Design a protein with these regions (language model features):
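Metal-dependent phosphodiesterase/nuclease catalytic metal-binding core
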Residues: 1-9
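Glycine-rich phosphate/diphosphate-binding loop of Rossmann-like nucleotide-binding domains
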Residues: 9, 14-20
Length: 149
């Protein structure tokens, strides 16, 4: 894998997208190339090409009906079938009520033997200044892990 990271996410009301961009900013601040990928704006095969080429894969999902977002689940199932190796992983997301998605995404990545950087940011409603600062810091940790690898 190259010294680059992908931040793969979907969003309902832009909160998870805002988090994704802040995490990407944190990763970029460490000198690691980063590509944010909005799932519904990209073809699955193109997403996987980037995933397989990256050292770190950070996945973001809003919580919908106590679950990760369906499009995120789809990407994770497809990713699992490709058996990616030697990946640093991260999970993050936003929620309104319960917020299970982050733990669910993290569990899926851990099951694929990703070296997880935890805990990932889990923010309720619209990210505020503190929440965005936590996302930038999380991205920095991901970038540092890529540089140390």
């Amino acid at each position: 894998p190259q010294k680059k990271a992908v931040v793969v996410y979907d969003t309902m009301w832009k909160s998870t997208e805002t988090m994704a961009n802040a995490i990407a900013e944190g990763i970029s601040s460490t000198g690691v190339k980063v590509k944010p990928i909005h799932i519904r704006s990209s073809h699955r095969s193109d997403i996987m090409t980037d995933v397989l080429d990256a050292a770190a894969v950070v996945v973001g999902s809003p919580t919908l009906n106590n679950q990760m977002f369906p499009t995120v689940a789809d990407v994770l199932v497809y990713m699992k079938g490709l058996k990616p190796v030697n990946k640093i992983g991260g999970a993050f997301g936003s929620y309104g009520w319960s917020g299970e998605s982050v733990k669910q995404v993290a569990a899926e990545l851990a099951a694929m033997k990703f070296s997880m950087i935890e805990p990932g940011p889990r923010l309720q409603y619209v990210p505020d200044g503190d929440g965005l600062a936590a996302c930038i810091e999380y991205g920095r940790k991901i970038g540092e892990a890529v540089n140390a690898d």
